[in-house]
Amino acid sequence: MSSVSQARSLGKYFLLIDNMLVVLGFFVVFPLISIRFVDSLGWAALMVGIALGLRQLVQQGLGIFGGAIADRLGARPMIVTGMLLRAAGFATMAVAHEPWVLWLSCVLSGLGGTLFDPPRSALVVKLVRPQERGRFFSLLMMQDSAGAVTGALIGSWLLQYDFRLVCGVGALLFVLCAGFNAWLLPDWKLSTVRTPLREGMGRVLRDRRFVTYVLTLTGYYMLAVQVMLMLPVMVNDIAGEPAAVKWMYAIEAVLSLTLLYPLARWSEKRFRLEQRLMAGLLVMTFSLVPIGLASNLQQLFTLICLFYIGSIIAEPARETLSASLADARARGSYMGFSRLGLAFGGALGYAGGGWLFDAGRALHTPELPWAMLGVIGVGTFLMLWWQFSQKRLAPGLLEQES
């Protein structure tokens, strides 16, 4: 095996271990935030939605800067610093008894993600060959699902004793992850050239096709982020106990572990990336619309199953399509900017979703927020269809697979 092939192989194992630690640390804490502050402490869903939206907006909205700096400095210092900041955010959340403290903790957590997320994504693009990326992203998603349910189980168990324990374990996992990267991650550069900060950002902003695609994904993410806000609250409301939330993540884990990889292998040979993304988005959209009418856990979990299946179809295609459109001369900048749709979608999805959820309760129309998400999903589908229609694209782009 050549030294390059060996580095790629070892690098992929490193990425998988690192990803598991990050996912565990995140899901120990974040799925329980809405349960802790909305249901246990009685805060308005809007207050918690603002906190979650701030984390999303800071982490993903500033991602282009984190990516551009990583293009200049390399991956390791950015990743280690970011993970320590995330740990500090969780430690602050443990003592949050007023909204501004929760908001501050989420901003710190988001700043940490701004530093470590783009270089980690760029490392995947660097270390995984283009023809293997779709399957590798599927493996990461399977790992995300297993880590999510494991983290949620740990967090739910700890929540019985004290929310501070939940935050402490999450912070500890990110400190361990920072040490893992500081010790084992080589001093790799992310881009094929040492790109100055301004040049890398400028290269992305001049790429009109990429910018349009990323901003369109705002609507997709407004739907996707509800697994952290409205879906857990709905499960808790119908079940009457926070422990039921773990079954929501168990459903995701089972579906992902059984369907994600084989579905990705099957669909990549038969459908283009944008077709898979749009099909998954439609399934997600039409599974969310009836949730406001669900009256028991069986109905709710059936709709959540359909939502996760849509995500399983869409997410590997979205990641692979984003990577395929990135310029190798500024990988970090591109991967950072690719998170901007998640920044806007997360902020609007959390804050807007929280406001609509409160309004639906006040007006005794619980279907209101879900109907609005349906409108957003259909609008996003039409925008993607317009961008990727045959007449608008240069020959060969639709056939491009990463």
Curated annotation (Swiss-Prot):
SUPFAM superfamilies, per the entry: MFS general substrate transporter
Entry keywords, A to Z: Cell inner membrane, Cell membrane, Membrane, Transmembrane, Transmembrane helix, Transport
GO cellular component: plasma membrane
Keyword Transport in annotation: yes
Membrane topology according to the record: Multi-pass membrane protein
Keyword Cell membrane: yes
Residues annotated as transmembrane: 13-33, 34-54, 99-116, 139-159, 165-185, 214-234, 243-263, 277-297, 300-320, 340-360, 368-388
GO molecular function annotation: transmembrane transporter activity
Record-linked Pfam families: MFS_1
InterPro entries: MFS (IPR011701), MFS_dom (IPR020846), MFS_trans_sf (IPR036259), MFS_Transporters (IPR050171), Multidrug-R_MdtH (IPR022855)
UniProt family annotation: Belongs to the major facilitator superfamily. DHA1 family. MdtH (TC 2.A.1.2.21) subfamily.
Protein name: Multidrug resistance protein MdtH
